[in-house]
């Protein structure tokens, strides 16, 4: 049986390098990852299809520049960061992205994808 410390260390390794976790999953299963935008995404459906759901909550980027071309000034920092990362190619290896539309910004996010 694994200890709590071992489990926490595994979670930390995944959080520190989500790309490696995604690549490892693809090697093990032959299926990739599906990006899920916050919130209200049916993660269970992604799991049932055999894919790894990857939460897309952005990152603590110091500079948002490219995303401003596509998003209105009132877009929240999460959506600006997600769009900036997408424009930089960070999400290129995802098999798909699922968008929900609980806010005005998310309604137009898929237009650039």
Specify the residue positions occupied by each region the protein language model found.
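An N-terminal assembly and electron-transfer interface module characteristic of large anaerobic redox
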Residues: 1-113
């Amino acid at each position: 049986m694994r200890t709590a410390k071992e489990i926490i260390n595994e979670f930390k390794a995944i959080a520190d390098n989500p790309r490696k976790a995604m690549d490892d999953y693809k090697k093990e299963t032959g299926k990739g990852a599906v990006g899920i935008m916050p919130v209200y995404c049916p993660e269970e459906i992604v799991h049932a299809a055999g894919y790894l759901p990857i939460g897309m909550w952005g990152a603590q980027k110091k500079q948002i520049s490219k995303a401003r071309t596509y998003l209105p000034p009132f877009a929240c920092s999460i959506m600006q960061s997600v769009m900036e990362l997408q424009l930089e190619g960070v999400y290129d290896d995802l098999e798909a992205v699922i968008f929900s539309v609980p806010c005005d910004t998310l309604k137009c996010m898929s237009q650039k994808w």
